[in-house]
Regions:
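N-terminal, well-ordered alpha-helical segments
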Residues: 32, 49, 75-79
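Short, well-ordered coil↔helix boundary/capping segments
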Residues: 24, 45, 67-71
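A charge-rich, low-complexity, intrinsically flexible signal that marks solvent-exposed coils, linkers
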Residues: 7-11, 15-32, 36, 42
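A short, structured beta-strand/loop element
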Residues: 36-62
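Short, Lys/Arg-enriched N-terminal segments with co-localized hydrophobic residues
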Residues: 1-6
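C-terminal structural segments of small proteins and small subunits
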Residues: 65-90
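Conserved short hydrophobic interaction patches
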Residues: 33, 37, 80-83
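Basic helix-extension-helix modules of the SAP/HeH family
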Residues: 12-18, 61, 82-85
């Protein structure tokens, strides 16, 4: 049958991604992490969703690949976290 995947808490997902940025991430979990890091949704164009962060000069643009987040977009987020010193708002 269809198993309903449970949401991963942003803090847990963040830890998992720091360990291995190549893992598959459900798009909704990825979005939850983005918001938990302090990003706000600025606009949607087709399947592309743009997020802005007060500390980041550039937009983070994401779109799902099926139900998952695209790997390069996950990596882009991790780069931004490192570059701008973003932290989870727990």
């Amino acid at each position: 049958g269809k198993r309903k995947s449970k949401m991963v808490k942003p803090s847990k997902l963040f830890a998992l991604l720091l360990e291995n940025s190549n893992r598959n991430v459900a798009f909704r979990d990825f979005l939850a992490l983005i918001v938990a890091l302090g990003f706000t949704h600025s606009r949607t164009k087709g399947s592309h969703q743009s997020y802005v962060h007060p500390k980041c000069p550039k937009l983070l643009v994401v779109q799902p690949k099926g139900k998952d987040a695209k790997r390069y977009q996950v990596r882009e987020l991790l780069d931004m976290i490192e570059e701008y010193g973003l932290a989870l708002d727990e």
